[in-house]
From Swiss-Prot:
Subcellular location: Plastid, Chloroplast
Quaternary structure annotation from Swiss-Prot or TrEMBL: Part of the 50S ribosomal subunit.
Annotated source species: Rhodomonas salina
Family per similarity comment: Belongs to the universal ribosomal protein uL14 family.
Main subcellular localisation: plastid
One GO CC term on file: chloroplast
GO term, biological process aspect, one: translation
A GO term, aspect molecular function: large ribosomal subunit rRNA binding
This protein's encoding gene: rpl14
InterPro entries referenced in this protein's UniProt entry, alphabetically: Ribosomal_uL14, Ribosomal_uL14_bac-type, Ribosomal_uL14_sf
Protein name, per record: Large ribosomal subunit protein uL14c
Function: Binds to 23S rRNA.
Annotated TM spans: none
Length: 121
């Protein structure tokens, strides 16, 4: 459950380390869950990388601390809130993705991110 002003870890090698959610895309939504696209501002970044501090970026939420219930009755929860920075075509800005991701991203057509991930839960 991600809302505005929420800090998220960045789980790729685009250069950003932490982003803060400033808007949730897709109608008048208060909260974002796994697979939702948000707009965020980079709060912490690695020097000499493509994404700089204070850049406004699009990102897709890939892990949340809030439990997500699936249709088959199973629930899944992660240890952190994490996102992957994407471009306008929903392709990741980085070339690697760190940590596990949820199966819900495959259902929402983020197949490039799913293919880069080391583990899909």
């Amino acid at each position: 459950m991600i809302q505005t002003q929420t800090y998220l870890n960045v789980a790729d090698n685009s250069g950003a380390k932490k982003i803060m959610c400033i808007r949730i895309l897709g109608g008048n939504k208060k909260y974002a869950s796994i697979g939702d696209v948000i707009i965020g501002v980079v709060k912490d970044a690695t020097p000499n990388m493509p994404v700089k501090r204070a850049d406004v970026v699009r990102a897709v939420v890939m892990r949340t601390k809030k439990t997500v219930r699936r249709q088959d009755g199973m629930s899944i929860r992660f240890d952190d809130n994490a996102a992957v920075i994407i471009n306008k075509e929903n392709n990741p800005r980085g070339t690697r993705v760190f940590g596990p991701i949820a199966r819900e991203l495959r259902d929402k057509d983020f197949t490039k991110i799913v293919s880069l991930a080391p583990e899909v839960l």
